[in-house]
């Protein structure tokens, strides 16, 4: 038997799928233009049509805090279990925590 591959996007069929109304490759410009400051709380909401700066699927829906900026991307501190993880995420995959509700 051959071992099945476990790539970066395994088991994400329904998680990384857009609804038919949201189809299309271009994220909204307003979502790209948002500037986050250090200390802002954000929700990681992966946009599956944008592959650059995409975090791993385990971070989908997690709330984190902006701790810095690296190029166009942001450094986001996320609690995963009992550990703090720092991930690099582009703004296409972030939503402000206050406006997410």
Curated annotation (Swiss-Prot):
The record's region (Disordered) falls at 1-23
Pfam families the UniProt entry points to: Ribosomal_L21e
Q: Which GO terms describe its cellular component?
A: ribonucleoprotein complex; ribosome
Coding gene?
Answer: rpl21e
Q: What is this protein called?
A: Large ribosomal subunit protein eL21
Q: Domain of life here?
A: Archaea
Similarity comment: family membership: Belongs to the eukaryotic ribosomal protein eL21 family.
State any GO BP term from the record.
translation
NCBIfam families for this protein = PRK04306.1
Q: Does the keyword Zinc apply?
A: no
Question: PROSITE patterns, from UniProt?
Answer: RIBOSOMAL_L21E
Provide this UniProt record's keywords sorted from A to Z: Ribonucleoprotein, Ribosomal protein
Entries under InterPro entries matching the protein: Ribosomal_eL21, Ribosomal_eL21_arc, Ribosomal_eL21_CS, Ribosomal_eL21_sf, Translation_prot_SH3-like_sf
């Amino acid at each position: 038997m051959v071992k099945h591959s476990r790539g970066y996007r395994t088991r994400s069929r329904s998680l990384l799928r857009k609804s038919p109304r949201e189809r299309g490759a271009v994220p909204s410009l307003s979502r790209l233009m948002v500037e986050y400051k250090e200390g802002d709380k954000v929700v990681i909401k992966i946009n599956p049509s944008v592959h650059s700066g995409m975090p791993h699927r385990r971070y989908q829906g997690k709330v984190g805090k902006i701790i810095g900026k690296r190029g166009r991307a942001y450094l986001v501190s996320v609690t995963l279990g009992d550990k703090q993880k720092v991930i690099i995420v582009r703004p296409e995959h972030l939503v402000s925590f206050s406006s997410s509700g």
